[in-house]
Amino acid sequence: MTPARRSALSLALLLVALASDLAAGLKCVCLLCDSSNFTCQTEGACWASVMLTNGKEQVSKSCVSLPELNAQVFCHSSNNVTKTECCFTDFCNNITQHLPTASPDAPRLGPTELTVVITVPVCLLSIAAMLTIWACQDRQCTYRKTKRHNVEEPLAEYSLVNAGKTLKDLIYDATASGSGSGPPLLVQRTIARTIVLQEIVGKGRFGEVWHGRWCGEDVAVKIFSSRDERSWFREAEIYQTVMLRHENILGFIAADNKDNGTWTQLWLVSEYHEQGSLYDYLNRNIVTVAGMVKLALSIASGLAHLHMEIVGTQGKPAIAHRDIKSKNILVKKCDTCAIADLGLAVKHDSIMNTIDIPQNPKVGTKRYMAPEMLDDTMNVNIFESFKRADIYSVGLVYWEIARRCSVGGLVEEYQLPYYDMVPSDPSIEEMRKVVCDQKLRPNLPNQWQSCEALRVMGRIMRECWYANGAARLTALRVKKTISQLCVKEDCKA
C-alpha cells in the first residue's frame, strides 16, 4: 500500500471514531442508574445537586436533557437549601458538594424576653387606641357644646341670668304683664336648662320629684318619663292657663324636655316647698286649732280660685282638679297650703259650653272618689259635676287635718280616710260598697264637740260628703265659712 493511501485510510478511521463519539453523546455520573453502571448519556449537560432534607444533605447526580437545559430550571441553586451545578464534559459531575455553612442562629428568647416583646407592642397599641377614642369623644363634646352654646346663647342674652332677676321677679313680671300664667317659653327653657338637680324627694305614678337649684334658689323638678308625655303636656298646659296664678296654687316656673342622650326626660319646674305634701306634714306634726284653720282656709282659697271663671279678654276658665288628696297638696313655709298636681284637671269653656277633658286613661285616687264617680252615675256633660266631686274630696282632706288637731292635749294619730273600712289599696268595688251601698263616711270623734272650730269643721265635712252632689257646699261657700272661723280664732292665712 502506498503511503498516500495509508494516510487516507487513517484519516477515514479517525473521522469514523469522531462520529461515533459524537453519536454517543456526553457521559455523566448517574446515581440512580445502577443498571448501566451508574452512567448516563445526554445531549445536554451533566447535573450534580445537594439538597437539605430533614436536616441532612442529600446528593443527586444525573443527566440533563437538552430541553431541560434550555428551560434553565435544573441549573439554579437556592440559598442554604439546594446547591446545583451543570457541566459539559464527560463525568464532570463526579464531584463532592456541600451546602454553604449557615450563619449561627440568633439567640433564642427566654420567657421574660418573649413576654416583653409581646406585651410592649400590645400596650402601645392599646394606649394609641384609647388616645384616639378620647380625642374623638373630646372633639364630639366640643362640637356639641359649641352647638348648644350657639343655640342657647340668644336665650341667655334674652333672659334673665345676666339680668340678676330672681324667680319671684320673673313670676311677678309674668303676672304683671297680664297673662298670670307663667314666664315666656324662651325664659322657661333657659331656666330649665340651667337647673342643677340636688336630690330626689318623691316618686309617684308619673315619675319622680327632685329638689333642684337655679341661681342659688330652690326649685322643684317633676320629671316625667317619655311614655307619660300626655300627662306632662296636660299639666304644663293647665299651669299656663291665663290668670291661674294664685298663692294657694303651686307656682309654675317652667316646662321643658331634656334629652340626656339615652332617653328624653320631660321636666315640670315649680316652686319648692321643703315641708313636702300635706300627707307628710300631718304624719310628722300635730297642729293647733289656729293651724288647722289656716291650712283649711288656704285649701279652700286655692280651690275656689281654681273653680272660679274669670270673664274678660285676660279671663280664666273654670277648672276642676279631679284628684284632690293630701298627697297632692303642698305645705308652704308659712304653714299654708298650695294645691298641686293638675295633670287630670278639666277646663270649662262657658262660651262654647264645652268641657276640655284630658285624653288620659288615668283616673283619680279611688279612696277620694265621690259616690257618683264610684257608682258611675256622674253626668260628665255638666261641668258642675266635676266641681262637686272636688268638694267631696276636700271634705276628706279636712278630716285628715282635724284628726291631727290638738284640743285639751288630746290628738288622734294620722290616718287616711276610711282606714278602718277598706284595705290600704282599695278597689273601686270595695269603695263603692262602703261609700255608696252602706253610705258610710269617716267617723267624727265626740271630743270635737268641745271645740267650736272642730264643730264647724265637722259640719263642713258632712256638707261636703252628701251623696247628692248638688247638695254639697261650693268651694266659695267653704272659703267664706272658714274665713269667719279664722277671724274668731285670730289666725291669719
UniProtKB/Swiss-Prot annotation:
- GO CC list: activin receptor complex; cell surface; plasma membrane
Show the Pfam families listed in the entry.
Activin_recp (PF01064), PK_Tyr_Ser-Thr (PF07714), TGF_beta_GS (PF08515)
From the UniProt annotation, give the residues forming the signal peptide: 1-25
User: According to its UniProt record, which cofactors does this protein need?
Assistant: Mg(2+); Mn(2+)
Residue ranges constituting the Protein kinase domain according to the UniProt record:
195-485
Q: Which reaction does it catalyse?
A: L-threonyl-[receptor-protein] + ATP = O-phospho-L-threonyl-[receptor-protein] + ADP + H(+); L-seryl-[receptor-protein] + ATP = O-phospho-L-seryl-[receptor-protein] + ADP + H(+)
**Major location (coarse):** membrane
| Stored PROSITE patterns | GS, PROTEIN_KINASE_ATP, PROTEIN_KINASE_DOM, PROTEIN_KINASE_ST
| Positions on the Cytoplasmic side per record topology | 135-493
The way this protein sits in the membrane is described as: Single-pass type I membrane protein
According to its UniProt record, the EC number is 2.7.11.30
| GO biological process assignments | activin receptor signaling pathway; apoptotic nuclear changes; apoptotic signaling pathway; cell differentiation; cellular response to growth factor stimulus; cerebellum development; hippocampus development; insulin secretion
- Tissue-by-tissue expression: Expressed in brain, kidney, lung, liver, testis, ovary, adrenal gland, heart, prostate, gastrointestinal tract, and spleen. Distributed throughout both adult and embryonic central nervous system and pancreatic islet cells.
Q: State where the protein is found.
A: Membrane
Annotated catalytic residues: 323 (proton acceptor)
- Domain named GS is located at 165-194
> So which stretches are on the Extracellular side?
26-113
Give the record's subunit note.
Binds the type 2 receptor protein ACVR2A.
> According to its UniProt entry, what is the function of this protein?
Serine/threonine protein kinase which forms a receptor complex on ligand binding. The receptor complex consists of 2 type II and 2 type I transmembrane serine/threonine kinases. Type II receptors phosphorylate and activate type I receptors which autophosphorylate, then bind and activate SMAD transcriptional regulators, SMAD2 and SMAD3. Receptor for activin AB, activin B, activin E and NODAL.
Family recorded in the similarity comment:
Belongs to the protein kinase superfamily. TKL Ser/Thr protein kinase family. TGFB receptor subfamily.
Q: What is the recorded name of this protein?
A: Activin receptor type-1C
